[in-house]
Structure formats: structure tokens, C-alpha cells
Amino acid sequence: MPLRPTVRLVLAVSLDGRLAFPGGGPAQLGGAGDRQVLEQALAWADGCLMGAGTLRAHHCTCLIRESGLLEERAKAQRSPQPTACVVSRSATPTFPEEWPFFQQPLERWLLHGEEAAAPSAAPAGFSQCLAMGTTWQETLAQLAAQGMQRLVLLGGASLAASCLRDDAVDDLQLTLTPRVVGGEHSWVPFDAAGLPPALASSDAWILQGAERLQDDELVVRYQRRLPP
């Protein structure tokens, strides 16, 4: 088993790199083509990482709906949906149990900050509650010990930045949507500090492919070049 899972950051962004419209709210820039490649990524994954703020914005997570993908997971004796891993500073976050998230047919784990006191039991609606390590490399090693080998990172921007800061993102899957929306909601926050200089190198990422989708969307896939 690998020392840590492979992490794939999957986002739909505008041509100017925004995740959402200037007014904020749920990130809903992608269309039908983006939905298709998103489900393909979910079908690849054992789990998906999402920030508590993203859950509060959407009240749910993405599910695999395409029958062929569900059949492939069933044949491989995998659960129909990847485990939803919600990342929160608090070990006892307040998420209303009436949100659709808690009725969705998947397993839910809570990953909380190491400084938070661990609860005696997982909060309502979650089957596991795990304390994160001091770095993402440590946290991912813990998830590998739980059987996670492939993770999709769904955002939001702060969570993506924290993983990039620890150089813990292996693959990028970005759907470019034909919009220029402006505003402050970039997929990497403008005030994100401490990103490794190596990520800015011209050879940091290897292009794996690009595919035109419906409605003039384009998905591009990059892989992190491993250091020598």
C-alpha cells in the first residue's frame, strides 16, 4: 500500500480562474460536460475531501449517477460512492442534520484540526472522526492506513491552498468554463502565502491531456512532476 493516497484536485473554474460568481455562494460554474468528468473522477476515488465551508455552501456533496460508472465500482467490489471526508477546524462542527448531505447514500468521515479536543464519539451523521496531523503529508498517511489510496479534492479554495502549501496535490483536473466573472473567489486565494516555490517552476506540472466538453468547456489534466 502506498505511503499516502494520490490526491487529485478537481474544480470547475472560469477563464479568469474564479470558482464562483462575485457574490459568492455555491460554486456552480460547470455544465453537463464538467459533471461527466467530475463523476469519472469520483468513480476513480476511494474518498473525496471537502472543506466545511464548501459543505455549508452546498449542503450536499456530488454523487456518481452514471450507471456505467456505478456498475464498474460494483464489479470491483467497491462502495457505490466514495467516502465524503469533511475537513473542519472543529471536532464538533454544527451541521444541521436536515441537510441533504446527511441523507445521501455514502459514508461520512470528519477530519478535524489537531488542536481540537477529540470527541468521545463521532458527531451525529459521521461514522468516523479523525484528528489531522501537523501537515497534510501526515494526514494523508493516516488516511492511507484507513485504506484510502485515491482521493479527490473538491475544495474550497482554502482547503486547496493548504494542500498545495504542503505540496500534497498530485494531479490537477480543471474544467475551464467559457465565462469571465471577476471578483475575489479565485481557486487559489489571492492571499495564499507560503506556497512552495517549486510549484511555480515551468516544469512543475506535466500535461496529461486536454479534452473539449459540451458547451465549449475544456478539461485539462496535469500531473505533479516528482522531484529527482
Predicted regions and their residues:
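Enzymes that bind and transform nitrogen-containing heteroaromatic metabolites
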Residues: M1-P228
